[in-house]
Swiss-Prot record:
Protein name, as recorded: Aspartate/glutamate permease AcaP
Loss of function: phenotype: Disruption of the gene leads to strong reduction of aspartate uptake, but only marginally affects glutamate uptake.
Upper taxonomic lineage: Bacteria, Bacillati, Bacillota, Bacilli, Lactobacillales
GO annotation terms (biological process): amino acid transport
Alphabetical UniProt keywords: Amino-acid transport, Cell membrane, Membrane, Transmembrane, Transmembrane helix, Transport
Location(s), subcellular: Cell membrane
Sequence intervals crossing the membrane: 6-26, 36-56, 91-111, 122-142, 152-172, 195-215, 238-258, 290-310, 342-362, 373-393, 413-433, 449-469
Gene: acaP
InterPro entries: AA/rel_permease1, APC_superfamily
Family: Belongs to the amino acid-polyamine-organocation (APC) superfamily. Glutamate:GABA antiporter (GGA) (TC 2.A.3.7) family.
Role of this protein: Involved in aspartate and glutamate uptake. Plays no significant role in the excretion of accumulated glutamate.
UniProt key word Transmembrane helix: yes
Organism of this sequence: Lactococcus lactis subsp. cremoris (strain MG1363)
Length: 489
């Protein structure tokens, strides 16, 4: 049997490929500059390591559950809360899906023109309409099956992983190899350069860090496949944290060598990764080659992510949905098994968010920043259910068996779960504050604040409405059944 077990280092590499990407480095550097190095170390120690080990215990305890987080919640609390967990997992992907068309446009704009002008010079109306067309096209294609794209997407994901590591190696090595390379950020040898100013503005950026290191629950299928999970799984998670830490710190230092931390480009979040590869390529004598390879792999990866994120979360929510909480019309399938009305609901919600910026976003750079920050507010909401399940598990820990336990002492375990829950919640709430100068554009500031607050509230309220509709539907069906009973004269 041991020959079929995977080792701790394999688990670490699988998880690393799932949770890490170059975008994590670029987005957080764009918000904090070189001081993000310290932030990475803090978030890893205070949040990511306990998060990953909490997931490990939940996976080990409910090793036969196939529903992931919603199954954990159902086993530790109620079916109703399990439905809300499943709904949250699906609905947080709505802003994520709305962002993908713009990312695809930006990537292929760099391939075609060698810069970010294709999208930045478009009007917001044109960007919104083209993005909507791209999304609707892939929404339709998702109903037809995309097996070929899944294979291509997997290859693109691997290529992106390699490019992210290559970027770090080349950037760190550039001063020693390319004689004309000059480090952009001054005083990078001074420790004070890396110390953040812990003010209110700083704490509004924490949600982006949480967003970057989240997603550890994706490793759930591998915990019980690990040899000696009690010893080897935590070892693998510490290796994972080490790899994430090294890539985050060195990646941020590499960004600081290419871009001046005190004078960051306004389009860094949208175009920073492409510009970085372009600059490195020029210094290493390969021109735009590295940038084009990165743009192609990222573009294909974004297409695959768009297609998968339309289909997979929807199936998780509706494939075995409880009729008590999800109305029949939403569970309805075609003869080919397509969740027709589920796709329609996805299309409506995503289309609204794609078109929403027309009411208050002035340019492409602000659109990318707003959508990225909106995702950093909404996406971590699903992590809350992980920590809730862990707290509830430890309340009744005597009733469950687990090969691996994060913390054996019940009270300490509940404190760890509560810490991660509150940290995530506070980060999401603070992340709602817009990341732009109020004085420069008050109307845009208020638009972003309102949309950042209302989007998660509306999405969650919609999920609370469905059980009410389902109950009405069932009462109506029961009433019709009673009316058909024929009583004898």
């Amino acid at each position: 049997m041991d020959t079929k077990k995977i080792r701790w280092f394999t688990v670490a590499f699988i998880a690393f490929n799932m949770v890490w990407g170059m975008g994590n480095v670029v987005n957080n550097f764009a918000q904090q500059g070189i001081t993000v190095v310290t932030s990475w170390l803090l978030i890893l120690a205070l949040y990511f390591i306990p998060y990953a080990l909490i997931v490990g215990q939940l996976c080990s305890t409910f090793k036969d559950s196939k529903g992931g987080v919603s199954s954990w919640v159902e086993n530790t609390s109620t079916k109703r809360l399990a439905y809300y967990a499943a709904w949250t997992y699906w609905v947080v992907h709505i802003p994520y899906l709305a962002q993908k068309p713009q990312a695809i446009l930006i990537a292929f704009g760099w391939v075609g023109q060698g810069n970010g002008n294709l999208v930045s010079q478009m009007s917001m109306t044109a960007v919104a309409l083209i993005s909507l067309a791209i999304f609707l096209a892939f929404l339709w294609l998702s109903t037809k099956g995309l097996n070929t794209l899944k294979v291509i997407g997997g290859l693109a994901g691997t290529a992106m992983f390699v490019m992210s590591l290559l970027f770090i190696v080349m950037a760190i090595g550039a001063p020693f190899i390319a004689k004309d390379f000059h480090i952009a950020t001054p005083d990078m040898g001074n420790i004070k350069t890396y110390i953040p100013k812990f003010d209110f503005s700083y704490f509004t950026t924490i949600s982006m860090l949480v967003f970057a290191v989240g997603g550890a629950e994706k490793i759930s299928p591998y915990v019980n496949q690990t040899k000696n999970p009690a010893k080897e799984f935590p070892r693998g998670m510490f290796l994972l944290a080490g790899m994430v830490g090294i890539c985050a710190v060195l990646g941020s230092i590499a960004m600081g060598m290419i871009f001046s931390s005190g004078n960051l480009p306004k389009d860094l979040m949208a175009n920073g990764a492409y510009a970085a590869f372009q600059i490195l390529g020029q210094h290493f004598g390969v021109g735009n080659f590295l940038m084009i390879v990165y743009a192609l792999t990222n573009g294909v990866g974004q297409i695959a992510a768009l297609a998968f994120s339309i289909d997979a979360p929807l199936r998780i929510l509706l494939a075995d949905a409880d009729p008590e909480y999800v109305p029949a019309w939403l569970r309805k399938k075609t003869n080919k098994g397509t969740l027709k009305n589920g796709y329609t609901l996805t299309g409506i919600l995503v289309s609204i968010i794609i078109l929403l910026p027309l009411l208050g976003i002035g340019d492409m750079n602000e659109l990318v920043k707003w959508l990225t920050n909106l995702n950093s507010v909404v996406m971590p909401m699903r992590y809350l259910w992980v920590f809730f399940a862990f707290i509830m598990l430890n309340r009744a820990v005597k009733h469950f068996q687990s090969e691996y336990k994060f913390i054996k002492q019940k009270r300490l375990a509940m404190i760890a779960g509560a810490w991660c829950f509150l940290f995530t919640l506070i980060a999401c709430v603070l992340g709602m504050v817009p990341k732009l100068d109020y004085a420069a554009n008050p109307s845009a500031w208020w638009f972003q604040l309102a949309s950042n607050i209302l989007t998660p509230i509306v999405l969650i309220l919609l999920g609370m409405l469905l059980p009410f509709i389902a109950r009405r539907e069932q009462r109506k069906a029961t009433s019709l059944d009673l009316d058909t009973i024929v009583t004898p004269d």
